[in-house]
A protein has these predicted regions:
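Extended glycan-interaction surfaces of carbohydrate-active proteins
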Residues: 1-31, 55-61, 67-70, 74, ...
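Long, repeat-rich segments with strong aromatic
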Residues: 208-239, 243, 253, 341-372
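Alpha-helical support elements that line or immediately flank enzyme active sites
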Residues: 33-63, 293-305, 353-366
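Acidic/aromatic-lined carbohydrate-recognition and catalytic surfaces
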Residues: 89-141
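Extended, well-ordered alpha-helical scaffold segments
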Residues: 49-60, 101-122, 225, 238-264, ...
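Aromatic/His-enriched, Gly/Pro-containing loop or helix-boundary segments
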Residues: 64-110, 346
Length: 450
């Protein structure tokens, strides 16, 4: 039995007939997650773990090839939604590091798979492409997401239960069976599923509205996808690439990227506030919301120098705390239903740190990138020293603490479950963050560690 693939195996090596290994986030997450895999993979590359880093991409490709998308995670109840599309940026990261170690046929295959994901998922007008020409997150399926814990949605279900004169559990049973039909609640769950596809589950920014938003973060990633495809086509395919009978020259991708950049300027850029905001396709208005995602156009290279200057000036002071970048600006929690949202302030997560550091450096804001990286790494070192090597999935960046009073708790924070390997993308953030620090700052971290 031990020699046979397990239930969570994905790609099988045709030579060894064994599963191609992948790295899971850690803690209770023992399957392969979509955008976690990109950031874990960056850490593997930084640590020169070629086989594992390549294996991560092979398993991503397997999912796109067989399930039509890179899944939220490889469980059957995630088949109806993806996560942020980092397959192409990860392919480029692999090739930037190891392009001389893989055959051209392998590159050709993965370029084609990248195109399949881009066209069939993110540019699909039936689901993700909006009438603005920009894309949105859209979780398919109906009703409550199956992976959520019992009682997770009670705060929302209660108002419908009261309307029907039922307790929450009985209403839930009748709604799930189809005995009670509530189109308004169905629509609310579409937004909830879409929020989970965004990876930011959950945040006030997307609550009850996610599927209506052409998002800053998603369109920044897709701009990066388009520019990466242009660069890879030039570098490895002499500017011309044919896939499934269609031609995709590098110029096609540059034109797509420029079109998206102009659409982002038209719909997402707010001249008065000097930043980008999500666009609501139903209200035909921007949704002003201070978020770490507002700085993602810098990571993608989609900002002009002047846009970058204004966005850094307007957003960074509201996001940078003593422990790093918060997910959002301050949230008014007085009238907020349900528990605290883990992707709201005061909580900060590794992927936002990594992308914002990279974006700041790309546009010449080295001092700000260094300041943000040092704040985050100093907090990680203190937490590890004070709590038995603790490295968790998220932190309270205002209190510089792993203690999180929000939905889902904090994976890795209970001592009996402290993951021996830390937590995937947080580990990567430490490795990459060191590259932003001065020698004096590194010495300070060493002194903290004793």
């Amino acid at each position: 039995i031990e020699d046979r693939p397990g239930l969570l195996a994905l790609k099988i090596d045709p030579d060894t007939h064994q599963p191609v290994p992948y790295v899971v986030p850690g803690g209770r997450f023992n399957e392969m997650y979509g955008w976690d895999s990109y950031f874990i993979g960056l850490g593997l590359i930084a640590h020169d773990q070629y086989e594992l880093a390549r294996g991560m991409l092979e398993n991503m490709a397997y999912q796109i090839r067989h399930y039509g998308r890179m899944l939220n995670a490889n469980r059957s109840y995630y088949l109806s939604r993806s996560q942020p599309p980092f397959y192409t940026p990860y392919l480029r990261a692999i090739l930037d590091a190891y392009g001389d170690r893989v055959p051209l046929a392998w590159i050709r295959e993965h370029l084609g798979i990248a195109i399949d994901e881009y066209e069939n998922v993110w540019m699909n007008p039936q689901t993700h492409l909006t009438n603005t020409g920009l894309s949105r997150y859209y979780g398919e399926g109906k009703g409550r997401p199956k992976e959520t814990e019992p009682g997770h949605f009670d705060f929302e279900l209660k108002k419908y239960a009261d309307r029907h004169g039922l307790d929450v559990r009985e209403f839930e049973r009748r709604y799930d069976s189809g005995e009670i039909v509530e189109p308004e609640l169905d629509n609310w769950f579409v937004h909830d599923r879409s929020m989970r596809e965004s990876g930011l589950d959950t945040t006030t920014r997307f609550d009850g509205v996610c599927a209506s938003l052409a998002c800053v973060d998603l369109n920044s990633i897709l701009y990066r996808v388009e520019t990466d495809l242009a660069a890879l086509t030039d570098l490895y395919m002499a500017g011309e690439f044919t896939w499934r009978g269609a031609s995709y020259p590098s110029g096609h991708w540059r034109a797509q990227a420029e079109k998206r950049r102009q659409l982002m300027k038209t719909f997402l850029w707010n001249e008065a506030d000097g930043t980008w905001y999500d666009w609501n396709i139903d209200t035909q208005r921007q949704q002003p919301f201070v978020s770490a995602s507002n700085l993602m156009p810098l990571w993608a290279g989609a900002a002009t120098p002047e846009e970058a200057r204004r966005a850094v000036a307007s957003q960074l002071p509201q996001l940078l705390k003593s422990g790093g970048i918060a997910s959002t600006g301050p949230i008014d929690k007085h009238n907020q239903p349900g528990p605290e949202r883990q992707w709201d302030a005061p909580y900060g997560w590794a992927p936002h740190q990594i992308m914002i550091w990279e974006g700041l450096r790309r546009y010449g804001y080295d001092a700000q990138a260094q300041q943000a990286a040092f704040a985050w790494l100093r907090m990680l070192v203190r937490a590890a020293i004070e709590y038995n090597g603790l490295i968790t999935e998220k932190f309270n960046v205002e209190k510089q603490s792993h203690k999180v009073d929000a939905e889902y708790g904090n994976v890795g924070a209970r001592f009996e479950y402290v993951p021996a390997g830390g937590f995937g993308w947080t580990n990567t953030s430490f490795l990459l963050g060191l590259g932003y620090l001065s020698d004096a700052q590194k010495a300070e971290l060493d002194a903290l560690a004793g």
